[in-house]
Amino acid sequence: ILCLILAGKVGSNIASEIGTMRVTEQIDALEIMGVNSANLLILPKIAAMVSFIPVLVVFSMASGITGGFLIAQFTDIISVSKYIYGLQSFFNEYYIWQAIFKALFFAFVISSVASYYGYKVKGGALEVGQASTDSVVVSSVIVLLLDVVLTQILF
């Protein structure tokens, strides 16, 4: 779920940023100066996403466990002892590593699809918005399909 949210927010930002640079001919200026524009613009975004999304996944797991504990503490839905017993008895370290591994793939897909759609924009502001929307839709579908495939492979 976290990666789908990030596909919408971060993916659209990447696509619109690179798309705006393409429309305003900043990428063309970089290429005229002899700079590899794809290497300069796309690689840092992919590296940042691949290194930071697994951290966000671990943080979201910790937040979920803490939220569950607080619900158990302040409501009568489940007792705190049953909640802690459930965490201890059903904990499997493999699930955490699996989530981190899947997050690496999702981060690469989100950033590379958004960068591709932003990099290939031709036209004006309307096309930048369309490329941003297309990148969100395509990366969300790929993340969902990749989640199914990776789950089948890892289990």
PLM regions: where:
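Hydrophobic alpha-helical transmembrane segments of multi-pass membrane transport proteins
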Residues: 1-28, 56, 113
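Short cytoplasmic-facing helical segments at TM-TM junctions of multi-pass membrane proteins
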Residues: 18-42, 128
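Selective transmembrane-helix segments that form parts of the transport pathway or gating/packing helices
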Residues: 41-62, 136, 140
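Final/C-terminal transmembrane alpha-helix of multipass membrane proteins
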Residues: 128, 134-150
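Membrane-interfacial helix-loop-helix connectors in multipass membrane proteins
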Residues: 62-104, 112-131, 153-155
